[in-house]
């Protein structure tokens, strides 16, 4: 933590222009090295426990592989960054082999779940955002609905309909009235909210553009604004253990949806501090006296959560999956916005400053060319706000 705190101070002290400094020797280079090291440890954890990793764990590492490929591509032709590019590429290659091997074990442990959600772990499914925006605080709900009606089973039904992987041999992008109502329901929180976002995010990845999916960006704007609010609440209670998984899931999903303000330096610092340094996983902390529940949030944190796999040493498949995908997003946005790309270095705004208008209409385009609304884009995504 002391090293991370020093890193944050170094980032805040950087001058606006430092192109004469060797990039790997700057604070950004140090930060990239810290992230890569954490991800390498997590990859070793995946390799060590591959026969027992569930599908949710595989999804997180699949997202990470895509992010690492993006980082490798951006750094490959930068002489100063080639060592970092090679590390990212080598890790991506390792993950590719491990993820292919994981399908063998998943067919044995949970064949039905694999059949239903296999598209989410297939190469080419996840696509990186090409443009970035920020959440709009005016879209935060003034109220929260009870979560009893939003079960994991209901979420699965709608996601399977969307993917077209049900037993009825339906086509992708299918939408029943039940799922239309459930996935656009206002006032949801916790995992219900993140799965609403996941539904429209997967619709974008699948190329669903008709009917309700014409409004996918509208709903992602709403959901990520509220997921940002929940992350601020998690931060306010000191990231108590039960909140960490949802906190990282929100960064993973909204980051992939193109919302740059989820990539805050202080949140990166927090996530890096949660890794088990010996095993490489994320999960229940060793610290005695850690609160086991967060008042008024127990129901939110326990509902609509993908199948969990906990190990005896406290490692969690789901926590580790969301952590690596969140960290991969931090690395990707760092690779996209640094001086060698010709951009001014990202501005850092302490004391919760916000350089962007909260009324700005969010939108996001993806590298596959799926179009979003034509609005002004933001250009400096990494901040400490």
Swiss-Prot record:
InterPro entries: DUF4735 (IPR031751). Glycosylated. Residues 1-20 form the signal peptide. Residues 344-385 are annotated as: Disordered. Transmembrane segments: none annotated. Keywords: Glycoprotein, Secreted, Signal. Predominantly expressed in thyroid tissue. GO terms for cellular component: cytosol; extracellular region; membrane. The keyword Ligase does not apply. It is found in: Secreted. GO terms for molecular function: protein homodimerization activity. Belongs to the UPF0764 family. Homodimer. This is UPF0764 protein C16orf89 homolog. The lineage of its organism: Eukaryota, Metazoa, Chordata, Craniata, Vertebrata.
